[in-house]
Amino acid sequence: MLLTLLFLATVTAQPAPAPQAKPAAPPPAKAADVETCLACHSDRTMAVTLPSGETRSLYVDLETFRSSVHGTKIGCTDCHQDMMTVPHEARPFKSLREFTVAYYEQCKRCHFDNYTKTLDSVHYQATARGDRMAPVCVDCHGAHDVKPPQKPKSQMSTTCAKCHEGVFTVYKKSVHGRFLEQTNDVPGCTDCHRSHDVAGPRNIAWQRRTPELCRTCHENKTLMDKYNLSTAVAQTYVADFHGMTASLHETDPNRTVSVVALCTDCHGVHDIAKVNEPGSRVLRANLVKTCAQCHPGVSDNFPGAWMSHYEPSWKKAPLVYGVQLFYNILIPFMIGGLVLQMLLHFWRVVVNR
Amino acid sequence: MTTYLIRFSLRQRVEHTLVMSFFLILSVTGLPQKYFDASWARWLINFMGGIDHIRQFHRFAGVSFTLLTAWHLMFAMGAVAAGRSPLSIVPNRQDFDDAIQMMRYYLGRTDQAAKFGRFDYRQKFEYWGLVLGAVVVISTGLILYFPILFTRFFPGELIPAAKVAHSNEGLMAFLVVILWHIYNAHLNPDVFPFDKTIFTGKISLERMHHEHPLELERIKQVRDIEET
């Protein structure tokens, strides 16, 4: 009887996602499902010991589940499909990790697009290599307690920090990381690395897109005005040697590697600093060292060859501006004069005939 | 019976062919670098094997052009020093007078076209324009080739300034050649479709009479020339 009810409950639960159902009043069918399971699983002492010696609590806190994103939308057996019979069949899991990994594919039944994205990720590459510690859905999102990932935004990054603690510590001190808790304006981990299809740091295609990544914010006028930052950084980069080469390598169909300074090569990656703070790599005092990463043995004058993202003007780079102005006047004057001379000559020749 | 004169020596003809080839290579590999953001430039760059290849071609042609220029100037200076050069390419007062007279002639203010010697003022202008332009592109090109070396002695701003000068000078040279030189050597009704003198070295007496009468007279004083 109980089982029939449960079965009916699961089937009838599938269609008709009640539009804007009040969170306080979950669909009764789901409630039935959850209640059925919780008849046993509300027991706090319920646990199972795995062959690895690890203990897995089988207690489910109703309030935690109810307040999760799934709390009012799906029931226990939507994910735990293999738990339809009571008592449940014996499970072959030897360790906790084995159990978690086994549930990896459950999420794709609803979240198929995000699941397929994970197949392109560096995390999945590790899973495919047989690395059982590589994260699967629930490692980041949680299981019974799945929360909206971006509320607050900093949660995304603190989630990554669970494994990537070293990088996160460096990032937290950076000009972006320092303000992670205060504002949504600064990029967190996933803004650059992506989330489901997260790219590995040695993924060349993704590395080459670095200027594009930085541009998404640093060319956004509203955002940059708020912090009194220039939006010409990408454009001035592309106008110079490094940016020109990088942009041409990007459209070169025959090229797989590109050795040229990208934004992060000068500004740093996770430790990116405000340009004028003492530790900044692009501070005039540190610039020779920064250039020397690629151009060993350069003199103190060498960094001056880079106009620091400025457009040439009388104030900044007067020599460059002067030369440009000279040619802006000379070329039209020269070409205009020659064309006039040609036309006069031609006209005279025609008239003479 | 003489129907033509030898106007250019073999050395001059070879120099012209070389400078023409280098100029073409330098333009084709240089201009797409100046306008790399344009779609035609991107296409051309990818077509020629990518930016790194193009830079190598450009430097190779640039070094060749530098050697040719050095050779030409050394030869010319040697000839001047030995007193063997008639200095006929050096601009003088007469060229300004000629230019003004030709302007008046074109505008119909006088019926008398100026009479030219071995080189007319336009040819002198083009020659010295090339020499001067060569000095600019070669020096700035070397700065761009060896920025680390140059910034040991000069401020860093020299590098972007050299880039601006190099690319603009190159553009101007390209435009002058495309418009002015192509007109004078090809489209000019007097020589259309092709003035072959710089390749064969020969010029007809008729053209000498028409274009360089003073030079013809000078030659007649030292050599016996029968005109047909």
Where are these regions (language model features)?
Chain A
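Bacterial N-terminal signal peptides
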Residues: 1-10
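Short sequence/structural segments immediately N-terminal
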Residues: 10-353
